[in-house]
Regions:
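Acidic, polar-rich low-complexity tracts and alpha-helical solenoid repeat scaffolds
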Residues: 1-136
Length: 136
């Protein structure tokens, strides 16, 4: 079975597909709660895998692939803890390559989702007022 998110995800893909099929075909199954929990755990693992790949590229200043992976985490796994982290790394990547409009839009989105988060506040301090102009 798939035990580490860093490794080949083929078994994880098969497992999550099986859980989703089970939930779709048997919505009132007594195994529903267990299947939902295991599917959620697998989603966290997939989010972690993509996030770590994005971090690999970000550390090497390969911003375009890093942005793609972070956007995938946000799009595919929005309910996982790594989604918030991916937003923060997107802000960091956009700032590094001076994509101010993308940085501002990402800050606006992450502030709506996590309004009282301190790290979000620090990462998006330049955009505390959504009407503020980006700094250069």
């Amino acid at each position: 079975m798939w035990r580490k998110p860093d490794l080949d995800a083929q078994y994880g893909l098969t497992a999550i597909s099986t859980y989703r099929t089970l939930l779709a075909i048997y919505p009132n199954s007594p195994l529903r709660d267990a299947a939902e929990q295991r599917a959620a755990k697998l989603e966290q693992w997939f989010a972690t895998k993509d996030y770590k790949t994005g971090m690999y590229y970000l550390r090497r200043k390969a911003y375009d692939p890093a942005i793609l992976y972070f956007r995938d985490v946000i799009r595919l796994y929005p309910n996982t803890p790594k989604s918030r982290d991916a937003y923060l790394r997107l802000v960091q990547a956009f700032h590094a390559i001076r994509y101010r409009e993308d940085e501002r839009e990402t800050c606006m989105a992450v502030r709506q989702l996590y309004p009282s988060d301190k790290q979000v506040g620090l990462a998006c301090a330049a955009y505390a007022d959504s009407t503020a102009l980006p700094s250069s």
